[in-house]
Curated annotation (Swiss-Prot):
Family: Belongs to the TGF-beta family.
Cystines in this chain: C341-C408, C370-C440, C374-C442
Domains: entry comment: The region required for head formation is located in the propeptide, which itself interferes with proteolytic processing of the precursor. The mature region has the same activity as that of BMP3.
UniProt name for this protein: Growth/differentiation factor 10
Subcellular location: Secreted
Species the sequence originates in: Xenopus laevis
Statement: the UniProt record of this protein carries the keyword Signal: yes
Subunit: Homodimer. Can form heterodimers with admp, bmp2-I and/or bmp2-II, derriere and nodal/nr-1.
Signal sequence bounds: 1-22
Taxon lineage: Eukaryota, Metazoa, Chordata, Craniata, Vertebrata
Length: 443
């Protein structure tokens, strides 16, 4: 008897310990971010999670996707001012340059839509009543209307009835033709009513996790245009004083900026960097060209180089003054870099350029850049074009003055997927081309 009593207490204690441990584990895991979206800091509602998965897919597959380069999301806004519950969508951010490829409506089964027959048969035990029960599918009608000036409810535009599975967590409806018509007719404010058979939904969902949303997959024809990323992501002029909003075009700057010398402007037109007057070095002093590496330098030039390291022989800078130790480190760092045209590392943080407030992901990316000389003879590794080869020969011969060396420029580039909020706080996913340098060449 005592043994059985002890075993009973022991089993009860084990049960309580396991129960407490299970609750502790559940409480801990509930605080963890969803898998795969912790790095982009999204909310846990279905729309945010859906866009997070699309971002991961587009980042993984890049330009190989057949779904275009743009995904726009539109969350429904509940509205009951027109008598019956409905949802409004503001599609005004959809651009004319974005060719709609596909559009889907996502909505949850509305609660309280069960008919009186369903409730009666659930309480009844008659087999005849159960035979009259509907199947696991449900007829749902979607009525779309235009909204004039975002206030007056317009005429009915689209009416579609479909059969959905009752046990589905979320329903998905293809509304590509509806969105295409709305874009073509510029009816970018639309409303939607959901009805079950002849009865409209009586439960009005205002919970963000239950609100319907629309995803539009489009191909933006203007995304490859010059300065396209600034047109979509730059919200203010970075050169504007005090960071205020600017009404100028993204590629213009205030008139109050410091004007450069005309000689600098002339040098920028011929692909040459402006001369640094306070620290002039000849090409032979900074670098040994590849075809002169085995040639012994004369003592005169060596003496000249040693003299350059003397602080007294360095001309004074009109802007900045550095001690000799700092200058030696800078020159040593410059000499350590590869002489030939090549890809150099550059990491861009969107916070540094003031875009982090609306860019969700990525927070930063490896952009790289191209730098280096394209002198004759050019190595095969820089993949020079025929024109660049001829230009380098003409430059080396020197028979035509003013001809610059070929430029070190990106040859192959990769795209970058960016998930951000537009000015209407809608989540947008775009795949911008030519965002990261993969290789460089002389052109």
């Amino acid at each position: 008897m005592q043994f059985s009593l002890v075993m009973s207490y022991y089993c009860l204690a084990c049960f309580l310990v396991m129960f407490a441990l299970g609750r502790a584990i559940k409480a801990h895991t509930s605080k963890l971010p969803p898998e795969g979206v912790g790095t982009i800091r999204l909310q846990s509602d279905p729309l945010s999670l859906h866009m997070a998965k699309l971002y991961e897919k587009y980042s993984r597959e890049g330009s190989r996707l057949q779904d275009g380069n743009t995904v726009r999301s539109f969350r429904a806004q509940p509205d009951s001012q027109f008598g019956s519950p409905l949802y409004r969508f503001n599609l005004s951010s959809l651009q004319q340059t974005e060719e709609v490829l596909a559009a889907t409506l996502h909505f949850a089964p509305v609660k309280g839509s069960r008919s009186s027959r369903d409730s009666y048969c659930k309480r009844s035990k008659k087999s005849s009543c159960r035979l009259l029960l509907p199947t696991q599918h449900q007829k749902i009608s979607l009525v779309f209307k235009s909204v004039i000036q975002n206030k007056t409810l317009g005429s009915e535009k689209w009416n579609t009835t479909n059969i959905f599975h009752k046990r589905a967590a979320w329903h998905v409806k293809d509304i590509t033709n509806i969105i295409k018509d709305a874009q073509h007719e510029r009816d970018l404010f639309i409303s939607m009513e959901i009805s079950f058979g002849e009865k409209f939904a009586t439960v009005f969902e205002n919970n963000p996790s239950e609100l319907p949303y629309i995803l539009v997959f489009a191909d933006d024809r203007a995304i490859s245009d010059p300065n396209s990323i600034a047109l979509t992501l730059q919200r203010y002029d970075p050169f504007q004083p005090n960071g205020g909003n600017s009404k100028q075009a993204p590629n213009t700057f205030p008139e109050s900026r410091v004007k450069r010398d005309t000689s600098d402007l002339a040098s920028s037109h011929d692909n040459e960097l402006p001369d640094i007057k306070y620290m002039r070095y000849s090409k032979e002093d900074l670098w040994e060209s590849t075809y002169k590496s085995l040639k012994h330098k004369s003592p005169r030039k060596e003496k000249k180089k040693k003299g350059q390291e003397n602080e007294e022989t360095l001309p004074k800078s009109p802007v900045l003054h550095f001690d000799e130790r700092t200058m030696k480190k800078a020159r040593r760092r410059q000499w350590d870099e590869p002489r030939v045209c090549s890809r150099r590392y550059l990491k861009v943080d969107f916070a540094d350029i003031g875009w982090s407030e609306w860019i969700i992901s990525p927070k930063s990316f490896d952009a790289y850049y191209c730098s280096g000389a394209c002198e004759f003879p050019m190595a095969k590794v820089v993949r020079p074009s025929n024109h660049a080869t001829i230009q380098s020969i003409v430059k080396a011969v020197g028979i035509i003055p003013g001809v610059p060396e070929p430029c070190c420029t990106p040859d192959m580039m990769n795209s970058l997927s960016v998930l951000f909020l537009d000015e209407g706080r809608n989540m947008v996913l775009k795949v911008y081309p030519n965002m990261s340098v993969e290789s460089c060449s002389c052109r």
